[in-house]
Amino acid sequence: MKNARLISPEYGGDGRKSPAPGAYSTPVVTFHSRRSAPVDLVFYSGKAFPGAYRGGAFVVLHGTQNKYGYNVVFVPFDRNGKPGAQAVFADGFAAFDPSSATPGPARYRPIGIAEGPDGALYVADSQKGRIWRIAYQGDPSRRTASR
């Protein structure tokens, strides 16, 4: 059933049941990461990062116990609220080579994100209780940030 809209099993679906027309709105953003789920987000309102990040969403993807996920993606939004292409903003939390066929368990698993009063981002980990501070270094008036 390619491109079909189905009701999830946790909401009474059976893998074939479609919702009534108009019952659900179309999602603004979808994430198609294998074995990874968006678990938290923050819309950036600070001024410590370049203006291109203002109003966009930083989304935490929580990976499974294999090589997928474990990162923070950025989704820009235009003035009309339309999302742009999402891109990985911060990665490396898993602390293993993602190209490995059997990488083993991840060292860290991002679970939450917040914007601090200083405009930095704070990412929390569910594996070891660590919190990372991500701050922009350079002139925030420049158009793009480097990782």
Report the location of each language-model feature.
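Beta-propeller domain segments
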Residues: M1-S100, G104-Y108, I134-R147
